[in-house]
Amino acid sequence: MDMENLTWLHGKPTASGILKANPEDFVVVEDLGFEPDGEGEHLLVRIRKNGCNTQFVADYLARFAKLHPRLVSYAGLKDRHAVTEQWFCLHLPGKEAPDLATFELEGCEVLEAVRHKRKLRIGSLKGNAFTLVLRHITDRQDVEQRLQQIAAQGVPNYFGSQRFGRGGNNLVQARLWANNEIRVKERSKRSFYLSASRSAMFNLISSHRLAQQLSTTVLEGDALQLSGRGSWFVAQADELATLQQRVTAGELNITAPLPGDSELGTHGEALAFEQACLAEQTELLSLIKRERVEGSRRAVLLKPQNMISNWWDDVTLELSFWLPAGSFATSVVREIMNQDRADDTDIIE
């Protein structure tokens, strides 16, 4: 998936700069959205890590606690080329907690450990707080104007390049799999390839909506989502004026599909628009249906919360903001500046 071909909401930036000159320039802190219970057969462990990916730390925790790897879980993957604070969950039914004071892994620090009644599962995360440092910025005035636009209107809610693997390989493999040119047995690879397929189709439809200036224009049959919620409903023709007002006010979001084996969910004009966008994606659609993946919807636009900018000097910007789970910080940066050096560091979920 070539991110350069996707439409910008605020036009292509004139400024360029560097994201993540070092890992400390990309800091991510998980927000579970709940407080641990303080009791239960699960142990939630919050770890600050630098230079370690999520699965590596989870496997190390399993060995340290003498647990099967399946008994250690987490809410979302984080890249190793960043400073991240994330939670891991150890299932310890009837067992004492391991002595985490003796836990040693280069680049990792245990911040706290709390008992909890439920397993921490993928996606059981409210969001993430980011603190980024953008360096060697060439046009401060353009960046400042874009920050104001982003605060008011948001950014496209695109899946970032990491979703598609290095060089887009996950999508390449998905197409080979769809055409029965390869067999994919590993569960993790199947998941990556299917996720890349659905994400690419979402990005494509969202980009077309932006290109036709329809990112905030309600079509008859659109699937609309209450801001901050996952559920959605279909816009009826006799409600368009009222629904348009609610979208403009930020109460509702227009969505695009993450296609599955069921119908897209839209009707009428909106359905025709989405079908036209997907007309040339028969390979990926057939794969999704063949593997019986459940479909869902995702907001076309994303508005960062609690966004604060702090210029260290005329070419260095510290930027902090909060995003809901599943959203990509690089999709925010993409609307601010062109990156002089490509870097796939990002949050995955």
Swiss-Prot record:
Query: Secretion signal: which residues?
Result: none
The name of this protein is tRNA pseudouridine synthase D
Q: Please tell me where substrate binds in this chain.
A: F26, N128, F328
Write the record's keywords in alphabetical order, separated by commas: Isomerase, tRNA processing
Question: Which GO terms fall under biological process for this protein?
Answer: tRNA pseudouridine synthesis
Q: Where is the active site?
A: D79
Annotated organism of origin = Yersinia pseudotuberculosis serotype O:1b (strain IP 31758)
Role noted for this protein: Responsible for synthesis of pseudouridine from uracil-13 in transfer RNAs.
Do the record's keywords include Isomerase?
yes
Q: Which domain of life is it from?
A: Bacteria
